Regions:
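N-terminal strand-loop element at the rim of the active site
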Residues: 3, 14-15, 19-77, 153-156, ...
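Aromatic "clamp/platform" in nucleotide-sugar-dependent glycosyltransferases that forms part
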Residues: 260, 279
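Short hydrophobic beta-strand element within catalytic cores of glycosyltransferases
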Residues: 296-299
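Conserved acidic donor-binding segment of nucleotide-sugar-dependent glycosyltransferases
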Residues: 311-322, 330-336
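A conserved mid-protein helix/loop that constitutes part of the nucleotide-sugar donor-binding site
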Residues: 26-37, 199, 203-222, 239-245, ...
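A short, active-site helix/loop in glycosyltransferases that binds the activated sugar's phosphate group
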Residues: 143-166
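A short helix/loop element that forms part of the nucleotide-sugar donor recognition site in Leloir-type
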Residues: 179-194, 346
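Short His-centered aromatic/hydrophobic patch
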Residues: 94-101, 118
Length: 376
């Protein structure tokens, strides 16, 4: 474990931090839980401001942090609630663009240091893209330090006017073997899903626009020509579920929508391939878990995926149905390539920062920003 906060080691009052989170991203939510656990263990007082559903899903209170329900909204009531929580904070750390913007509003007129972490590339088009650029400029100019989870995000923050932008060592908790039900074997999981004598493919993402599920359904039409026909299972819930289910039934696609699951680790461990048709996360949780679990990954070359996985996955152009379909078919027919990807994935995962690395870096930033200034 990395050292405790320098404030604690020098007998100063406990460092009080507020983590601001929207709760809409699995990657940033998992990161905040991991960060909170590490900070609490090192003597830092942590309050997480996030929607109640985020605490139910990630149990910030379970790792020793205080949780305060703050809606994912920039309305005056929500901003006022956040401002109240931040009143006695030594430092505020916001995760993601929208959470950061709310933190900027809440800290208006105060000198409290603000650390901002950008976990993904916010994707937008047209008028929304212009608004996004304005928000980004407002946030990075107000932030004391901006942490970007990829070099691309660091460059983006600097281009928007950040005073101090740094590359962040961000890790999510590594899944452990056995997961939630250690006695539940891979063969049992496959039997429950109906994939005993056929390949099992898995995708994990909310059923929202822009996640690439339409591409997967298009690809599934071609996969019907393979013998045996692979089964694609999609773990995740969202507003497009009914639309996708109708299409699956109308076209008789070999796809099952599983809804929200708490056993994703077991599903992944039982799969032959993990599929990531699109991700704007800088450090995709699914990509990390797939490589840790030695499950070959097929992914679109978007966001931070290339930097994250290197050569340890099959990467295809974004929104290229034929390329994605072909990559899956080739991998299913090439056991030697799958084994090579497993080994390369293990080596690539070993190069990623650990949770301890992440906490150590963040804590060093906190100490730097809250260290008493010498009198001049």
């Amino acid at each position: 474990m990395s050292p405790v906060s320098s404030r604690v080691s020098h007998g100063q009052s406990t460092l009080r931090t507020v983590q601001v989170l929207g709760g809409g991203s699995a990657g940033s939510s998992a990161h905040v839980r991991s960060l909170a656990a590490g900070l609490v263990a090192r003597g830092v007082r942590v309050t997480v401001c996030a929607p109640a559903e985020a605490d139910r899903a990630y149990s910030f209170t379970g790792v020793g942090a205080q949780h305060v329900h703050v809606p994912r909204s920039s309305d005056p009531v929500s901003v006022a609630a956040l401002r109240t929580v931040c009143a006695d904070a030594d430092l505020v750390h916001a995760h993601g663009l929208h959470a950061s913007f709310r933190a900027v509003l809440a800290l208006s007129g105060r000198s409290t240091p603000l650390v901002v972490t950008w976990h993904n590339h916010a994707h937008a088009e047209g008028a929304r893209a212009h608004l996004m650029r304005l928000l980004e400029r407002r946030v990075v100019k107000a932030a004391t330090v901006v942490l970007g989870t990829t070099s691309e995000l660091v460059d983006r923050a600097r281009g928007r006017g950040a005073r101090d932008a740094r590359l962040a060592a961000v890790a999510v908790p590594r899944p452990t073997a056995g997961y939630e039900h250690p006695d539940r074997s891979c063969s049992k999981v496959r039997a429950e899903l109906g994939a005993i004598d056929r390949p099992l493919l898995i995708a994990v993402a909310s059923l929202d626009p822009g996640r690439g599920h339409e591409l997967l359904l298009d690809a599934a039409r071609a996969w019907r020509l393979i013998e045996p026909v692979p089964l694609l299972v999609v773990a995740g819930e969202g507003p497009l579920r009914a639309e996708f289910q109708r299409r699956i039934e109308d076209e008789e696609l070999p796809v099952r929508l599983l809804g929200r699951r708490d056993d994703v680790g077991e599903l992944l461990a039982a799969a032959d391939l993990a599929l990531l048709p699109r991700s704007w996360e800088a450090r995709s949780v699914l990509a990390q878990e797939a490589l840790h679990a030695r499950v070959p990954l097929v992914a679109a070359r978007t966001g931070g995926i290339p930097e994250l996985v290197g050569d340890a996955a099959e990467l295809v152009p974004d929104q290229d149905v034929d390329a994605f379909t072909g990559a899956v078919i080739r991998l299913l027919g090439d056991p030697e390539r799958r084994e090579a990807l497993r080994d390369m994935g293990t080596r690539q995962a070993a190069t990623w920062p650990t949770e301890d690395d992440t906490v150590a870096q963040v804590l060093s930033v906190y100490d730097e920003l809250t260290r008493p200034r010498p009198l001049t």
